[in-house]
From Swiss-Prot:
GO terms for biological process: cell division; chromosome separation; DNA replication. This is Segregation and condensation protein B. Keywords: Cell cycle, Cell division, Chromosome partition, Cytoplasm. The gene is scpB. Participates in chromosomal partition during cell division. May act via the formation of a condensin-like complex containing Smc and ScpA that pull DNA away from mid-cell into both cell halves. The keyword Chaperone does not apply. NCBIfam families: SMC-Scp complex subunit ScpB (TIGR00281).
Length: 179
């Protein structure tokens, strides 16, 4: 199989799948005819091709996964044909809780409530509905509490590739102290 064909197979798989996909998953689909490094090179070639041609489709990187999506430069046109989800804006309490989860993850509901000083059931439900957090398992201690993490949707919302791109939390503590 030619390298160019493999690049187009990767492109087709990503288009059909629609969700973020890892290099390992792509490698499995291609039957390991290429190394992970070669698949990453192919992905980077596709990303660059789309970028250079200013195409309506782009490939974005989210943590260690890649996803094909529409180019945000053309969002106004996409909105005309797709009924946008009616997502209500997030309250201050919801944003605070999301921030806590983003910086402290994995974290339990009790730990969130200890930091905020109030119950957070409704806030967590809102974050689930907006697909900004997910259950990431359970702690191995009494009661087996659920632990929460942010999702790829959270990364997309902030237009970042990984949590490492979040600003250092010290910056926020300085602002809070100065107010």
């Amino acid at each position: 199989m030619k390298r160019e064909d493999i690049k187009y197979i990767i492109e087709s798989v990503m288009f059909a799948y629609g969700e973020p996909i890892s290099i390992k998953e792509l490698n499995y689909i291609i039957n390991k005819e290429l190394s992970s490094k070669e698949i990453e090179i192919m992905l980077n070639l596709l990303i660059e091709e789309y970028r250079e041609q200013n195409r309506g489709i782009q490939i974005i990187k989210l943590e260690n996964k890649y996803q094909m999506c529409t180019n945000k430069d053309y969002a106004e046109y996409i909105k005309k044909i797709i009924e946008p989800k009616k997502k209500k804006s997030l309250s201050q309490a919801t944003l605070e809780t999301l921030t806590i989860i983003a910086y402290k993850q994995p974290i339990t509901k009790v730990e969130i409530e200890d930091i905020r000083g109030v119950k957070c059931d409704k806030v967590l439900q809102t974050l689930f509905e907006n697909e900004l957090i997910r259950e990431a398992g359970r702690l191995n201690k009494i009661g087996k509490p659920i632990i929460y993490k942010t999702t790829d949707e959270f990364l997309k919302l902030l237009n970042i590739e990984s949590l490492e791109e979040l600003p250092p939390i010290e910056n926020y503590q300085e602002v809070a102290t100065n107010e």
